[in-house]
Amino acid sequence: MLGGMQDSAEAVDLSKEAWRVFVYGGCVSRDTVAFADPQAYSLVKYVARNSLLSVGTDARIQLPELVLPSAFQKKMVDLDASGELLQELRKMRGVDVILWDLNIERSGVWQFDDGSIATNSAELRRVEGMGSVLENARFIAFGSEEHYSRWCTAATMFVAILKELELKERLLVLAPEWAAKDIQGAKNKRVAGESIEFYNHVFSTYLAHLENLGVAIVRLADTVSDPDHKWGSAPFHYEKGLYNRLDEEIRSFARKKNPFDR
């Protein structure tokens, strides 16, 4: 759960040539930045595979030693387990844009006996010994009444804290619909047993709550995926044109805060 943060935030130097971007979420935001003009953005921080429900809890004592194939994977699982997203954001008050997409929420979360939460990421499940640990945890599925209710409460607190930090107006949610088909017309496969339509419908209810909180959201419909995407075929791995559209939306949003192009 989220909690108040009392210490003063650090400011980031604004004397830069590219839009300084903090990415919180998944591949939609990260790929948009990665596929853009390399001079357009400076990625100051990338927080991946962290559900909003884990923020403010500390599940590290519940987990075995985190041995993973890459340092990045270990860092992300450790940050998720520590629940310290807000501490990272407090260092970023000078960023131009905070990009957020909700894709990781699809995985659901695990709650332990002490109330702490860990995101049900593929990386978490890959940790040796995690299977037996999760046998004693309770799974909260994406789209369930409990997940939605708790997520909305967490989102309300999260946005309120961003407002206190003067970051709410720099928050932009990227929300293209998952693609039902790829550019060749082939239907995309179900994800974790659920249809693309299921995910688009459920995500829309979460996004509606953010809209009610006054959060800026970029919604794109009629999307198509690219089976030759750098990270493989998936309904959220889009064709290049969609990333160009998102790039334009980000630049337009950023210029409202800093009225000059870079």
How does the language model describe each region?
Residues 2-97, 255-257, 261-262:
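Basic, amphipathic N-terminal segments that precede the first structured/catalytic domain
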Residues 65-140:
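A basic- and aromatic-enriched beta-loop-alpha substructure that forms the phosphate/nucleotide-
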Residues 72-73, 107, 128-156, 185-195:
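Surface-exposed cleft-lining segments at the edges of enzyme active sites
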Residues 82-84, 144-160, 192-207, 240-244:
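Well-ordered, non-membrane alpha-helical segments in soluble/globular domains
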Residues 91, 153-172, 205-219:
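A structural motif corresponding to the C-terminal end of an alpha-helix
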Residues 173-177, 213-231, 235, 261-262:
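Acidic carboxylate-rich catalytic motifs and surrounding loops in phosphoryl-/glycosyl-chemistry enzymes
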Residues 181-219:
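Substrate-gating cap/lid alpha-helix
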Residues 230-262:
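Histidine-centered active-site loop/cap adjacent to the catalytic His
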